[in-house]
């Protein structure tokens, strides 16, 4: 494919180095700017940012109101709604542990009518004589709060009770009609049983199905099945109307020789004649027993055959189309649908019937299914049909006709109880070829009739069943839709409450606010966000895991599938997933295929269907027009692969191309191609698009690679991959972890906590204001990883909108950096890398290459107890001074303190009941004046497995309770931060406006007070510049405008400051009985150690088996020791060859960097030309090549300096470099093209026999850390029933000595050890007390008792009425004495 447009590379200090990319296709990067668009758009559509457009909230209010009381005396109307601003910002909500929400207020109008008379039957209103309308007694209008709505953060998440959560989108079957078959599995004969199902968005399901006898039935909500004729009769159709609806009629006219029938070609196709085919003139055209082909039938028609004769007897067995009555005597000859017999033929002659209509049923193309079903239900009436349906759904009641009719209408035909939704109506219209308005979201009679018709056609062999796994039949429910459904439930509850209140309230005193209880809606929303299966604790391990979680699609959850019942078909990859759902990224366990990820370019349309983008092809030429297609639309077009070769005019080079069409691959001419893929990577998800050489890996390993990248822990120093895919910067920018510039401007000030930018539009030369960015420092994520943002810009830098100005965790220069580039050798080493184990160099640990920071949160709650309040204090009973060394005077640990297991973080005492002292203690107290503590130590201690540094302390004191010194200090620090922000903003605003004022004044070139104006300005304070009065009116007007803008911005800065101070002084609302909460955050440093899990990006995972001294590690010829040794046997069987290609490309990248570094170390004018030429060779065929040629020498040197550690490369998915391209890079770096080198044994210094594959791989440290898993116990808790130690680290349990371990001891004959394991070390209560006493006494003897598990077994046997008792055998004891 042709390369993209050349763009000059602009070097700046804060952007990443552009990658040497092997992409051949033109990327539509606009589609990748917002990776969490799926969440944001859905939520915005619900809340209706633009109130002119119908939104979810607006529609709900309009459907609920107006509400009138039961007698119609008053009405409550909806006028408008408004959404307020959040009380606290996102960070403050996390800190306070509250929900990030906005208040919703609605304006209600309460109208009370004037009435003359009120009775139970009717109300007589007073009518206005002028307008002839009901006369109004009074109107009251009021704005009412209906509760708070959790609102979405700028990152697409929700903060519920201080915790970030994500609402996962759900894949479910689209509303509409579906036709299917049982695939011959129901009956042993293998006969296909066809069925249809109408699924609404809300309401009862309606199923139609055939049985083995081809009788058609229907079910409502999967209840007992009934003949479909009952439903048709309940819809008001008679027998003849039903037959007219489902069958064509054939007119038979009687003549003396038989019946004259119109000749229709289709009726004779493939028919063997049972009689001679004779025209009306008596000519025999075709003899009996002749099979008529389509060709012969068409010839007869073309020869002029319009009508033919049927002998009288041949109508026997046909079905009459309508009731046949003798007009003279009014005698019923035949009923509609009845089969004609010889008796009926005689009656036709007797009553001289000259014309009859026959149902077109030939048993080949048209079957008698509806007719047979009609005869099954014994000709029941409309009322009986309604009763039969009512009886199945509401058994045990005897209803009236009106009740049954209202019930039946409510099932499918009333909006309140049944809703197909717009999507369902579109699908029904599309499926059945109807043209019913999209606003009609209930079923119609036509819908039901057309569904039955199509099902009958399927049984007759016409058409195909639906593929329920086709993405045209599955849609996505996103966050906005979920909240809308919950909102609707809350509003319906509120409506019922309003109706109840209206029936009992005095209207004269009532106001709109009296009718609304805001807690109703809040309760429903809280339940959904807190406990729904699709409202999930956000995976915040690293930026990629955040993005992936927000783009996840789940088939589970309410209204979805269950993992136990989901079959293989629904989990499998479907052809329509191409470009919509990633075929790679899915969990490995029982949820495989049920949880998936949105493809990288896919988007979800307003109806919830997934669209994929394609570039339009016009007569073999690829245009730049991008169109999004649905899965249903895509099957109609021929779509070429993105890797198709184009010439310089964007025309296909090949005459014939492989294309996708209707789920198959076909070869077509280039002129027939309709579309082409926008990119080869459009098939995969965000995580899979980050794996270089994905196409060289087995799919199972690619799946593991995608999933393990989400488990990578952010490291102490982030390092972007040398071999990437080009997606790293896009994922970083879309993750919300980095700080993006809101507006273009010039960086004014930067420190560790703030970036201050003077927003400025260069093109318009317009000042826009001040943007202050607060950086997040050492904050705890949901998964205890560290969130820490570092500024990239420096004062004076010009930044554009959406530039990355600060890195977050696992981000390096605006690129995703989940791991580290390390030197890897593929070889065996002393068996320590057996079974995927990893051998690592001590140098890696020493340099903190894979060290990560984790932040643990510990909470201490101070309560008001029945005996008095608990207190935070430094003087704690029975605790020595050394243990209090980390605490301040208040009793709270100092920030920066190094704490280890058992240290006190918060000193706290709890009152205890007074105890009566013995006389001797009272005497000592009296003599020595010793203080007797009436409280106990309840301090917050650091758990045993934690050691680290205190990085932050939060103190929340209940509003109205006196604050301690520490909380006052923390508050003062926050106020100082607000002051700093305000002063920064005022400084920037003042600097700009005074510069502008000076420019305006100086440009006048006048004198003021007998001085040059510029000199005069220097001599007076800046504030006095505004007071200068000039004679020029235009200059005064300019100064006035500047002053007005300046004052407005300064006032705005002070206003924001005052609001922040007010919120801070407001205090904290804590739970009942809680006086104070102290949260201590401890940063724990995790070094790499044996037992930690590591992985590459290709599914190559392993556990560290040994950390080898650096001097013992194999080393290169130049003495460089390798960092990691991997087992080469881990590659062939796993078929993830991508890791080897990455090794070679990484090896070339680093050595090219070394070569550039060597040139830079000896730089002069000649070598600059050599450097430019060398970079020209490295970036050959790249757009960047032209930028390098035109760079100044200084820019070139700065650019080359950033390539010292390696030349960053991009191997996009399905567009990675070929073998020859990697070989060329290795040659350019003066390396062996095999990618292998001689290695030397670090222990003995000898060269290994064979060359070894060595290179640089991007390795990740996963969050399965040995520190979190390793566990030991000596004394601990026991189970209540079994009296055995509990299991698991969380319960501080023991190690289970299981069945197989017992076998091992039995095999060795270690009887006493076995006895010890099964008794005193397990559940022998008496024995363990005795052994404890023996240990204290220093005695080595112990005695075993009866294990508690034996007693449990005995009791279980007794519960089965089996009395088991232990008896001592006297003879056995006697024999034992004699033997002794």
UniProtKB/Swiss-Prot annotation:
Upper taxonomic lineage: Bacteria, Pseudomonadati, Pseudomonadota, Alphaproteobacteria, Rickettsiales
Signal sequence extent: none
EC number: 2.7.7.6
Organism name: Ehrlichia ruminantium (strain Welgevonden)
InterPro entries: DNA-dir_RNA_pol_bsu_ext_1_sf, DNA-dir_RNA_pol_bsu_external_1, DNA-dir_RNA_pol_su2, DNA-dir_RNAP_su2_dom, DNA-dir_RNAP_su2_hyb_sf, RNA_pol_bsu_bac, RNA_pol_bsu_CS, RNA_pol_bsu_protrusion
Protein's job: DNA-dependent RNA polymerase catalyzes the transcription of DNA into RNA using the four ribonucleoside triphosphates as substrates.
Keywords: DNA-directed RNA polymerase, Nucleotidyltransferase, Transcription, Transferase
Gene Ontology MF term list: DNA binding; DNA-directed RNA polymerase activity; ribonucleoside binding
Enzyme category, top tier: transferase
The protein's assembly and partners: The RNAP catalytic core consists of 2 alpha, 1 beta, 1 beta' and 1 omega subunit. When a sigma factor is associated with the core the holoenzyme is formed, which can initiate transcription.
Known catalytic reactions: RNA(n) + a ribonucleoside 5'-triphosphate = RNA(n+1) + diphosphate
Protein name stated in the entry: DNA-directed RNA polymerase subunit beta
SUPFAM superfamilies, per database record: beta and beta-prime subunits of DNA dependent RNA-polymerase (SSF64484)
Family: Belongs to the RNA polymerase beta chain family.
CDD domains documented for this protein: RNA_pol_B_RPB2 (cd00653)
GO cellular component: DNA-directed RNA polymerase complex
Gene3D superfamilies: 2.40.50.100, 2.40.50.150, 3.90.1100.10, DNA-directed RNA polymerase, beta subunit, external 1 domain, DNA-directed RNA polymerase, subunit 2, domain 6, RNA polymerase alpha subunit dimerisation domain
Keyword flag Transferase: yes
Single GO biological process annotation from the record: DNA-templated transcription
């Amino acid at each position: 494919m042709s390369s993209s447009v050349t763009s000059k590379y602009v070097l700046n200090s804060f952007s990443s180095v552009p990658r040497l990319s092997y992409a051949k296709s033109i990327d539509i990067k606009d589609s990748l700017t917002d990776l969490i668009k799926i969440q944001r758009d859905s939520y915005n559509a619900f809340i209706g940012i633009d109130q002119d457009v119908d939104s979810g909230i607006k529609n709900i209010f309009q459907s609920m109101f107006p509400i009138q009381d039961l007698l119609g005396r008053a009405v409550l109307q909806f006028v408008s709604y408004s959404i307020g601003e959040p009380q606290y910002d996102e960070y403050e909500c996390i800190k306070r542990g509250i929900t990030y929400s906005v208040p919703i207020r609605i304006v209600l109008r309460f109208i009370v009518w004037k009435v003359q008379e009120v009775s139970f039957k009717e109300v007589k209103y007073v009518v206005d004589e002028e307008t002839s309308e009901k006369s109004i007694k009074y109107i009251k209008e009021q704005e009412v709060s209906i509760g708070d709505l959790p609102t979405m953060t700028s990152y697409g998440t929700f903060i519920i009770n201080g915790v970030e959560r994500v609402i996962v989108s759900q894949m479910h079957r689209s509303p509409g009609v579906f036709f299917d078959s049982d695939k011959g599995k129901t009956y042993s004969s293998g006969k296909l049983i066809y069925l249809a199902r109408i699924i609404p968005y809300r309401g009862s399901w309606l199923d139609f199905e055939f049985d083995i006898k081809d009788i058609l039935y229907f079910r409502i909500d999967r209840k007992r099945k009934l003949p479909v004729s009952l439903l048709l009769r309940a819809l008001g159709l008679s027998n003849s109307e039903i037959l007219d609806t489902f069958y064509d009629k054939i007119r038979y006219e009687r003549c003396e020789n038989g019946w004259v029938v119109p000749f229709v070609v289709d009726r004779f196709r493939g028919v063997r004649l049972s009689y001679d085919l004779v025209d009306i003139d008596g000519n025999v055209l075709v003899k009996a027993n002749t099979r008529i082909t389509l060709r012969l039938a068409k010839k007869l028609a073309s020869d002029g055959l319009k009508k033919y004769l049927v002998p009288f007897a041949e109508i026997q067995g046909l079905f009459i189309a309508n009731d046949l009555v003798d007009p003279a005597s009014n005698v019923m000859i035949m009923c509609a649908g009845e089969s004609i017999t010889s008796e009926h033929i005689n009656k036709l002659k007797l009553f001289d019937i000259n014309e009859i209509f026959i149902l077109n049923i030939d048993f080949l193309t048209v079957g008698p299914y509806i007719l047979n079903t009609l005869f099954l239900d014994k000709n029941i009436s409309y009322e009986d049909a309604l009763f039969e349906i009512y009886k199945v759904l509401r058994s045990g009641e005897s209803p009236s006709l009106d009740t049954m009719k209202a019930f039946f209408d409510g099932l499918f035909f009333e909006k309140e109880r049944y809703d197909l939704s717009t999507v369902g109506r579109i699908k029904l219209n599309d499926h059945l070829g109807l043209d019913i308005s999209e606003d009609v979201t209930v079923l119609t009679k036509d819908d039901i009739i057309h569904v039955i018709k199509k099902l009958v056609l399927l049984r007759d062999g016409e058409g195909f069943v639906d593929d329920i796994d086709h993405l045209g039949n599955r849609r996505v429910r996103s966050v906005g839709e979920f909240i809308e459904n919950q909102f609707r439930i809350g509003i319906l509850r509120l409506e019922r409450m309003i109706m109840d209140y209206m029936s009992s309230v005095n209207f004269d005193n009532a106001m709109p606010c009296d009718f609304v209880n805001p807690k109703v809606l809040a309760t429903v929303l809280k339940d959904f966000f807190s406990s729904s299966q699709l409202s999930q604790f956000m995976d915040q391990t690293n930026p990629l895991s955040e993005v992936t979680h927000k783009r996840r699609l789940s088939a589970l959850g309410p209204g979805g599938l269950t993992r136990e019942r989901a079959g293989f078909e629904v989990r499998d990859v479907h052809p329509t997933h191409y470009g919509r759902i990633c075929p790679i990224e899915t969990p490995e366990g029982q949820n495989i295929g049920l949880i998936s990820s949105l493809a990288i370019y896919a988007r979800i349309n307003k109806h919830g269907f997934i669209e994929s983008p394609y570039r339009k092809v016009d007569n073999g030429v690829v245009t730049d027009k991008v169109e999004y297609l649905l899965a249903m639309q895509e099957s109609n077009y021929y779509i070429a692969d993105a890797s198709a070769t184009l010439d310089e005019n964007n025309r296909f080079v090949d005459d014939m191309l492989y294309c996708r069409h209707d789920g198959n691959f076909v070869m077509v001419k280039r002129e027939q191609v309709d579309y082409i893929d926008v990119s080869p990577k459009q098939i995969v998800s965000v995580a899979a698009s980050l794996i270089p050489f994905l196409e060289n890996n087995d799919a199972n390993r690619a799946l593991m690679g995608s999933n393990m990248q989400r488990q990578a822990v952010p490291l102490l120093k982030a390092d972007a991959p040398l071999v990437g895919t080009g997606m790293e910067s896009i994922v970083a920018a879309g993750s919300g972890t980095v700080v993006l510039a809101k507006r273009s401007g010039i960086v004014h000030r930067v420190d560790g906590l703030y970036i201050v930018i003077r927003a400025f539009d260069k093109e318009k030369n317009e000042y826009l204001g001040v943007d202050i960015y607060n950086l997040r420092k050492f904050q705890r994520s949901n998964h205890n990883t560290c969130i820490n943002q570092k500024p990239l810009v420096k004062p004076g830098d010009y930044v554009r909108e959406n530039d990355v100005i600060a890195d977050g965790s696992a981000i390096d220069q605006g690129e995703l950096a989940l791991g580290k580039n390390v030197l890897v050798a593929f070889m065996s080493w002393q068996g320590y890398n057996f079974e995927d184990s990893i051998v690592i160099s001590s140098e890696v640990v020493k340099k903190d290459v894979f060290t990560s920071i984790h932040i643990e949160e510990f909470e201490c709650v101070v309560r008001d107890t029945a005996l008095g309040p608990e207190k935070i204090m430094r003087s704690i009973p029975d605790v020595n001074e050394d243990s209090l060394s980390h605490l301040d005077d208040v009793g709270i640990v100092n920030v920066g303190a190094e704490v280890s297991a058992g240290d006190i973080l918060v000193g706290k005492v709890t009152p205890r009941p007074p105890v009566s002292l013995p006389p001797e203690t009272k005497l000592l107290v009296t003599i020595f004046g010793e203080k007797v503590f009436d409280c106990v130590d309840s301090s917050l201690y650091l758990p045993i497995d934690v050691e680290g540094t205190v990085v932050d302390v939060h103190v929340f004191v209940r509003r109205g309770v006196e604050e301690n010194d520490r909380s006052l200090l923390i508050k003062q620090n926050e106020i100082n931060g607000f002051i700093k922000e305000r002063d920064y903003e005022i400084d920037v605003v003042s600097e700009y406006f005074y510069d502008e004022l000076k420019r305006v004044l100086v440009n006048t070139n006048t004198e003021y007070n007998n001085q040059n104006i510029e000199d005069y300005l220097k001599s007076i304070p800046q504030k006095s510049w505004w007071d200068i009065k000039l004679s020029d009116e235009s200059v005064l007007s300019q100064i006035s405008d500047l002053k007005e803008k300046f004052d407005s911005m300064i006032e705005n800065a002070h206003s924001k400051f005052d609001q922040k101070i007010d919120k801070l002084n407001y205090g904290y609302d804590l739970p009942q009985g809680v006086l104070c909460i102290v949260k201590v955050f401890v940063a724990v440093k995790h070094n790499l150690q044996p037992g930690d899990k590591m992985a590459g990006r290709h599914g190559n995972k392993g556990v560290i088996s040994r950390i080898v001294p650096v001097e013992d590690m194999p080393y290169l010829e130049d003495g460089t020791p390798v960092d990691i040794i991997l087992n080469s046997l881990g590659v062939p069987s796993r078929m993830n060859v991508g890791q080897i290609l990455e090794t070679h490309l990484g090896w070339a990248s680093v050595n090219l960097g070394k070569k550039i570094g060597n040139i830079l170390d000896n730089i002069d004018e000649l070598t600059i030309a050599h450097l430019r030429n060398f970079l020209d060779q490295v970036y050959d065929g790249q757009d960047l090549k032209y930028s390098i040629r035109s760079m100044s020498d200084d820019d070139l040197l700065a650019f080359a300096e950033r390539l010292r550690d390696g030349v960053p490369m991009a191997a996009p998915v399905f567009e990675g470099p070929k073998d020859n391209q990697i070989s060329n890079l290795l040659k350019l770096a003066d390396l062996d093209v095999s990618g292998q080198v001689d290695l030397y044994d670090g222990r003995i210094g000898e060269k290994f026999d064979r060359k070894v594959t060595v290179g640089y791989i991007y390795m990740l440290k996963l969050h399965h850390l040995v520190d979190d898993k390793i566990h030991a116990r000596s004394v601990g808790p026991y189970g209540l029933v079994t009296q055995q130690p509990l299991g698991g680290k969380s319960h501080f349990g023991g190690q289970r000595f299981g069945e197989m371990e017992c076998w091992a001891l039995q095999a060795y004959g270690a009887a006493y050890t076995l006895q010890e394991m099964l008794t005193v070390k397990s559940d022998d209560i008496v024995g363990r007390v005795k052994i404890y006493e023996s240990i204290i006494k220093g005695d080595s003897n112990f005695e075993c008792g009866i294990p508690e598990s034996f007693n449990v077994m005995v009791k279980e046997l007794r519960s089965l009425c089996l009395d088991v008792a232990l008896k001592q055998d006297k003879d056995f004891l006697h024999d034992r004495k004699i033997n002794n």
